[in-house]
Amino acid sequence: MKLSQFKFKLPEEKIALHPTKYRDESRLMVLHKRTGEIEHKMFKDILNYFDDKDVFVFNDTKVFPARLYGNKEKTGARIEVFLLRELNEELRLWDVLVDPARKIRIGNKLYFGDDDSMVAEVIDNTTSRGRTLRFLYDGPHDEFKKALYALGETPLPHTILNRPVEEEDAERFQSIFAKNEGAVTAPTASLHFSRELMKRMEIKGIDFAYITLHAGLGNFRDIDVEDLTKHKMDSEQMFVTEEAVKIVNRAKDLGKNVCAVGTTVMRAIESTVSTDGHLKEYEGWTNKFIFPPYDFTVANAMVSNFHMPLSTLLMIVAAFGGYDQVMDAYHIALKEGYRFGTYGDAMLILDK
């Protein structure tokens, strides 16, 4: 498939700048894959499409405050540092992106905090914007991490949410079950699940399985090739535990529904499948890129937000729901006033 096939006109006012007051009160478009039928519901109605022993697979990654603002030594120029991942605990080494990149060179010292209490030295260039920083901090690692994160802010994707970070973002840009720290962006489909909704799902007998995929900035990176077979995804760290495997495979063996909550879950579970179509334990990295046509093995239902034009996330959804049906559904969503993006509305795709 070609990149240009995922282009559509998305007016700026259709992008949600804030979440709905209650997590489960966003709108939900339900697409029935086999018939093409579309229903317009509230997110809390998702419960009505699943039964006892069906399984929802969630990504329990936790977003950390990855965006820092600081100053460069001598010039005092304001800089932005985006923390990607810690490379070495002992040496306090971090893989980061910097802005403005042309002014930040090896050997430069960067200062953070009102009193310049946190200092980092640039020790390597990794890409045009990528750098390796060594933080000059004496003290236990836990203390360092706490001090570093206290200086950071919620890493809202500026390409989608073009507004300053607000207090509520620290809570709302995080799922209620976020546990394993390591993501620099939230798995957005999971943001719709409230405690009340999950309690009602439990009462109905629906099972939950949790995997971890630390969502990275690659989700927002522009694709620069027209031929999608030539695109390379950034690698992301993922963990599929024995417990998750048991829950998912039991549901599959019983002929029950398995619903992947979000594109990160779909990529993770499709990255570790045995030849007989069962989920396998896995700890490592994935750079799996899913686009149409693609045969899915594990899940037969999927929840996802409404994504940006030309994004890899839209491609996964189109691969699962069928290209024509999903693109038609997106046009209907625009016409019906659905909200797009990180804090937008959701779509449920059912294989029936």
From Swiss-Prot:
Catalytic activity: 7-aminomethyl-7-carbaguanosine(34) in tRNA + S-adenosyl-L-methionine = epoxyqueuosine(34) in tRNA + adenine + L-methionine + 2 H(+)
Coiled-coil positions: none
An MF annotation (GO) of this entry: S-adenosylmethionine:tRNA ribosyltransferase-isomerase activity
Keywords carried by this UniProt record: Cytoplasm, Queuosine biosynthesis, S-adenosyl-L-methionine, Transferase
Involved pathway(s): tRNA modification; tRNA-queuosine biosynthesis
EC number: 2.4.99.17
GO cellular component: cytoplasm
Signal peptide limits: none
Main localization category: cytoplasm
Subcellular location: Cytoplasm
EC class: transferase
InterPro entries associated with the record: QueA, QueA_dom1, QueA_dom2, QueA_sf
Tree of life domain: Bacteria
Entries under Pfam families matching the protein: Queuosine_synth (PF02547)
GO biological process: queuosine biosynthetic process; tRNA wobble guanine modification
Reported function: Transfers and isomerizes the ribose moiety from AdoMet to the 7-aminomethyl group of 7-deazaguanine (preQ1-tRNA) to give epoxyqueuosine (oQ-tRNA).
Subunit structure: Monomer.
Family: Belongs to the QueA family.
Official protein name in the record: S-adenosylmethionine:tRNA ribosyltransferase-isomerase
Source organism of this protein record: Bacteroides fragilis (strain ATCC 25285 / DSM 2151 / CCUG 4856 / JCM 11019 / LMG 10263 / NCTC 9343 / Onslow / VPI 2553 / EN-2)
